[in-house]
């Protein structure tokens, strides 16, 4: 029986028609003289009715079917009796009286219920992913993914972009994370790398005159995993010639507005606010600030320059900072709750956490006796503290204070229920430093990647004051999650060689890793820039999920394995010999 309709295409306008349906048995209910079956296909559910008065043979076969059997049915669409309508179903006003049924495939009892809101170990869900994806919420996530990617393609096509695929097997040029390496059988002892991004190829496409490129690209990074990371992931990759930062930012805002409206029915306001990197780090403790709530961190370093409180004075004398966070309405916190925040601060690198409880007629704190009245007054004024508030302090090197205060801010936002979960709050973070100093390796590293252009006015201080150079970079952040990052690129060979030199790369190493790119820059390279978005992260936020694994068809676990296929796995000795490889025992 070849189906004539999907389940949810059936409505009151088709009542009286003969229909043929295919799908899975969702539930089966035997009411004595009648058997009711909810038939599920990708579109949804329709109720089937088996009656011996309609077709006795079909009724007896329905007695034998079970959940997840795949069946084909033929019958007549009817209105449900008024008292039995189901307002929770799109097809809740109709049902099909079955005249013929065929079992296309029986099914074993599933290891978990095929329904939403199940409490099942995620590894079990991943082992039986083909069953997990039958659940409505997982199906809906994949349908949302399809709509979002289609919106991306349609939008960029309408703006003159062309989709070009770049190589999966390429040269190893590590961009921060470790590469996944693929041994070559044809060239023994040599390896391809799976791309961490199409960065170099898309820039070469600009040299080739493609002008507007995009790709829904698969990327691979051998790094430690967490809820929003996978070893293989998808990104929307874009690059344009003859543009500046403003052109890219405006285009992306228009695209995001269209994606959210067409794919999810959500209206977002543009233009998005912009926040300089330094301000984000000072006021929110993160370059991925969540702006759905306040609790801004304030700078106290200048006003406390002459403080006698040793903890603050020591931090300032060693080139550090003192900052404070006014936890509004947290003055009722117990000492145990405050100590828990202090422990969290220490876990994240702080030496401790000073605090002041602001009460109606007094201040409770172990540090007020070390502060002058003027300092206390300035602290209260700068933080806007009132009775019932709790002031938390961070005093250390700027990067440590930013990290710790940012984590405390998020914890307090969650604890006090300040985060508007349904709100979509976009922000551009701009004016990044081009470089950051690695204390362990005693050299500068690229904040984003080594192809990001410095501000033109900063090129002259690249050698003398590299830490002060600002990048022509921009990140798009949504609700505290980085959606994507981009920049205007270096497009001249001498500037790119200068960047490699500042990063401590010798001319020989630069030629070995990037010689093909440097040579391409000698044949007329247009100014260009672009951006890349994590499709999985975007979908995680759109779908309201806590992990990218819920919006990917076949993700890996947090140990980078696949319970269903048992990848990664060993390979045969013959395969290793063909690749000139030998496994060394640990």
From Swiss-Prot:
One of its GO terms (cellular component) is cytoplasm. PANTHER family: ASPARTATE--TRNA LIGASE, MITOCHONDRIAL, ASPARTYL/LYSYL-TRNA SYNTHETASE. Residues 199-202 are annotated as: Aspartate. Its EC number is 6.1.1.23. The record marks 31 as: Important for tRNA non-discrimination. It is an enzyme of class 6 (ligase). This is Aspartate--tRNA(Asp/Asn) ligase. The gene is aspS. GO terms for molecular function: aspartate-tRNA ligase activity; aspartate-tRNA(Asn) ligase activity; ATP binding; catalytic activity, acting on a protein; nucleic acid binding; transferase activity. Keywords: Aminoacyl-tRNA synthetase, ATP-binding, Cytoplasm, Ligase, Nucleotide-binding, Protein biosynthesis. L-aspartate binds at residues 175, 221, 448, 489. It catalyses: tRNA(Asx) + L-aspartate + ATP = L-aspartyl-tRNA(Asx) + AMP + diphosphate. It comes from the Bacteria. The keyword Membrane does not apply. One of its GO terms (biological process) is aspartyl-tRNA aminoacylation. ATP binds at residues 221-223, 230, 482, 534-537. Its main location: cytoplasm.
């Amino acid at each position: 029986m070849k189906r004539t309709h999907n389940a949810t295409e059936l409505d009151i306008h088709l009542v009286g028609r003969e229909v043929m349906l295919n799908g899975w048995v969702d539930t089966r209910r035997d009411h004595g003289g009648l058997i009711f079956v909810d038939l599920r296909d990708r579109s949804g559910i329709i109720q089937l009715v088996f009656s011996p008065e309609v077709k006795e043979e079909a009724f007896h076969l329905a007695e034998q079917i079970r959940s997840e059997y795949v069946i084909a049915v033929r019958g007549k669409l009817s209105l449900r009796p008024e008292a039995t309508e189901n307002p929770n179903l799109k097809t809740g006003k109709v049902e099909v009286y079955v005249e013929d049924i065929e079992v296309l495939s029986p099914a074993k009892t599933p290891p978990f219920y095929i329904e939403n809101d199940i409490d099942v170990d995620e590894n079990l869900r991943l082992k039986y992913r083909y069953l997990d994806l039958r659940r409505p919420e997982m199906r809906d996530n994949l349908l949302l993914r399809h709509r979002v990617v289609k919106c991306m393609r349609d939008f960029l096509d309408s703006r003159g972009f062309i989709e070009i695929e770049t190589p999966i097997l390429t040269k190893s040029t590590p961009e921060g994370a470790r590469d996944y390496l693929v041994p070559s059988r044809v060239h023994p002892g040599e390896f391809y790398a799976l791309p961490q991004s199409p960065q170099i190829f898309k820039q070469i496409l600009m040299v080739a005159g493609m002008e507007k490129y995009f790709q829904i690209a698969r990327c691979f990074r051998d790094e430690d995993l967490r809820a929003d990371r996978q070893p293989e992931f998808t990104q929307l990759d874009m690059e344009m010639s003859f543009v500046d930062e403003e052109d890219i930012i405006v285009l992306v805002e228009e695209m995001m507005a269209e994606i959210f409206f067409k794919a999810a029915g959500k209206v977002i306001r543009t233009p998005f606010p912009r926040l300089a990197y330094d301000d984000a780090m000072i006021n929110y403790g993160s370059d991925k600030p969540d702006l759905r709530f306040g609790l801004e961190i304030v700078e106290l370093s200048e006003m406390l320059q002459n403080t006698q409180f040793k903890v603050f004075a020591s931090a300032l004398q060693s080139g550090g900072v003192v900052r404070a966070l006014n936890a509004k309405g947290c003055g009722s916190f117990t000492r145990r709750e405050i100590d828990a925040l202090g422990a969290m601060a220490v876990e994240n690198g702080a030496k401790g956490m000073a605090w002041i409880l602001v009460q109606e007629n007094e201040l409770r704190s172990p540090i007020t006796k070390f502060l002058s009245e003027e300092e206390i007054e300035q602290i209260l004024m700068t933080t806007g503290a009132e009775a019932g508030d709790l002031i938390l302090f961070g005093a250390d090197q700027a990067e440590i204070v930013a990290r710790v205060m940012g984590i405390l801010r998020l914890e307090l936002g969650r604890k006090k229920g300040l985060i508007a979960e349904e709100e979509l709050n976009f922000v551009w973070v701009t004016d990044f430093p081009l470089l950051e100093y690695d204390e362990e390796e005693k050299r500068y590293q690229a904040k984003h990647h080594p192809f990001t252009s410095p501000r033109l006015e900063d090129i002259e201080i690249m050698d003398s004051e590299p830490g002060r150079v600002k990048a022509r970079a921009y990140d798009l952040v949504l609700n505290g999650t980085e959606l994507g990052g981009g920049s205007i690129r270096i497009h001249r060979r001498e500037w790119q060689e200068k960047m490699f030199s500042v990063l401590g790369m010798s001319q020989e190493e630069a030629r070995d890793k990037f010689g093909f790119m440097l040579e391409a820059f000698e044949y007329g390279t247009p100014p260009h820039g672009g951006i890349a978005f994590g499709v999985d992260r975007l979908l995680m936020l759109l779908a309201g999920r806590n992990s990218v694994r819920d919006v990917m068809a076949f993700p890996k676990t947090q140990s980078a394995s696949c319970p269903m296929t048992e990848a990664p796995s060993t390979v045969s000795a013959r395969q290793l010999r063909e690749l000139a490889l030998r496994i060394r025992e640990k």
